[in-house]
Amino acid sequence: VESRGLGDVYKRQIAYLSRKARKMLDDAGFEDCTIVASNSLDEYLIRDMISQGAKVDSFGVGERLITASSSPVLGGVYKLCAVEKDGKICPRIKISDNVAKITTPCFKRPWRLFDRETGKAIADLVTLNNEVIDDTKPYEIFDPDFTWKRKIVENYVAKPLTVQLFKEGECVYKFPPLDEVKKYCAEQIDTLWDEVLRFDNPHNYLSLIHI
């Protein structure tokens, strides 16, 4: 079922037309024939089709996935966090009137905290690169923008989120096969709470700084 060039009216009829097509195919003895819907689909359109009883076996998702249409621009900028002087690392900070542009000095390391009982992700946080989180002890974290928002985390597991890819210009990382990458991504999504994953009014996932 392809909506290319036929406008939004046709696109809104995909659920209905897929049901009609399924019946026609089945009546003709082509029960094993699959129906694919494509063209500018995203998770919201796919959800609507499914809720409308669309008889679609697979969805072709193209530009909406490739370009991340809801957030097409990543506002990322490299900022100096430290310099080496006389063999020592000296932290550096950028000062700005805009709080969001003030950097955290020195080399850093991201972590993810998981609830030990449920396995669900609690929060992501940033520490200095040489720090190690002792997850046998309570841990206090706070929001970097609203620093009065603090939380004591207990009964958790702390896992670092980065691995070394290059060392002195040489690749030291063995890239896993795509099947393993896919499996890992699915497992990580399963660690998120349903309230974070829902389409409408999702809870904000916590990204914090440790104390």
Task: Describe the residue ranges of each PLM region.
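Residues that form or flank phosphate/diphosphate-binding pockets in enzymes
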Residues: V1, Y16, Y44
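Active-site-adjacent beta->alpha loops and helix N-cap segments on the catalytic face
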Residues: Q13-R19
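Small/polar loops that bind or transfer phosphate-bearing groups
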Residues: A37
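Gly/Ser/Thr/Ala-enriched C-terminal appendages of enzymes
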Residues: R12, K23-A28, C33, L41-I209
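Single conserved hydrophobic/aromatic residue that forms the stacking wall/gate
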Residues: V1-L6, Y10, I209-H210
